[in-house]
Amino acid sequence: MKPQYQIHPFSGEASEDQLQSIYDLNQANTPEVGSLNSMAHLKQLIDLSAYNLFVLSSKEIVGFIICMREGSSYQSENYKFFSQRLKKFLYVDRVAINEPHRRMGLGQAIYKDIFAQASNNDLPIALEVNTLPLNQPSLKFHEKMGFDRVGVKDFDDRSVAYFIK
């Protein structure tokens, strides 16, 4: 039987249990998403964010996305890449789906909501994907979803490709 999923927006008013689940899911998906050093770090990201969703299956959080708008005080080098190039944008800081729930259309469902949010506000969507270590599934997914590669950057310990749609 195929699991039932519900997608819900969330903010800093999410419950401690929900935040813990999101934190745990984030940490389980590193290095595909950046590691968070504490729950306080997650709460800080959420306070800086503009639009967030989590996915429930049988009352368990199995996916999430955290997005920022332009003008945030977020200090990520990747966020700054887009801040220096775009006047308005919706930045996908991190998205993760629990392994057993991948390839079931959840990524497309989450992005359908993000596309609607961006369209309603006339915003391009900006994000980066790791190329070192290589996150091939994410590269393929975002290219399939219509994102265009607009740049690359090498850091000391990793490299990323930048995308806009």
Which sequence ranges carry the predicted segments?
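Short amphipathic alpha-helix that is part of the acyltransferase structural core
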Residues: M1-A40, E60-V62
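Conserved beta-hairpin
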Residues: A50-R69
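Conserved acyl-donor/pantetheine-binding loop and adjacent beta-alpha core of acyl/acetyltransferases
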Residues: I66-R94
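A short, internal acetyl-CoA/4′-phosphopantetheine-binding micro-motif in the GNAT/acyltransferase core
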Residues: D93-R103, T131-L132
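Conserved acetyl-CoA-binding loop-helix of GNAT-fold acetyltransferases
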Residues: I97, R103-A116, K144
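Conserved GNAT acetyl-CoA-binding A-motif
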Residues: A118-T131
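Conserved active-site alpha-helix within GNAT-family acetyltransferase domains
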Residues: L132-G151
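C-terminal "cap" of GNAT-fold acetyltransferases
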Residues: V152-K165
